[in-house]
From Swiss-Prot:
The glycine cleavage system is composed of four proteins: P, T, L and H. It comes from the Bacteria. InterPro entries: 2-oxoA_DH_lipoyl-BS, Biotin_lipoyl, GCV_H, GCV_H/Fam206, GCV_H_sub, Single_hybrid_motif. One of its GO terms (biological process) is glycine decarboxylation via glycine cleavage system. This is Glycine cleavage system H protein.
Length: 130
């Protein structure tokens, strides 16, 4: 079973969400997602200032096997895209919950975070997918 940190929230599309001290959220793809994709060769995070809607595609990750959209887990404004991934996309593979983060969002409505999956529910989702 892939690592699923207890302190994060998750989406059914395999993104993780960490609420930061300033109220913003950091978003990336889960260890399960990066394992399914394989070695990443390209990551295109959204630019700062981009308005995103919950469950809307807003970034792209590409591996040697496939390209996949990354979906905004909540609505809000992107405050930062992880530009370091341009030169080091493999950080998503080696440290998906750390240096491999994809974007930071200032939430439009923090109650959307409450609707995300906790670690136990996400683990159940992954197990059900087989």
């Amino acid at each position: 079973m892939s690592q699923v940190p207890e302190d994060l929230k998750y989406t059914r599309n395999h993104e993780w969400v960490r609420v930061e001290a300033d109220g913003s959220v950091t978003v990336g793809i889960t260890e399960h997602a990066q394992e399914s994709l394989g070695d990443l060769v390209f990551v295109e995070p959204p630019e700062a200032g981009t308005q995103v809607q919950a469950e809307e595609a807003c970034a792209v990750v590409e591996s040697v096997k496939a390209a996949s959209d990354v979906y905004a887990p909540i609505s809000g404004e992107v405050t930062q895209g992880n530009e370091a991934l341009a030169d080091n996309p493999e950080a998503v593979n080696t440290d998906p919950y750390g240096d491999g983060w994809i974007m930071r969002i200032q939430p439009a409505d923090t109650s959307e975070i409450d609707g995300l999956l906790d670690a136990a529910a996400y683990q159940e989702l992954v197990a059900d997918e087989g």
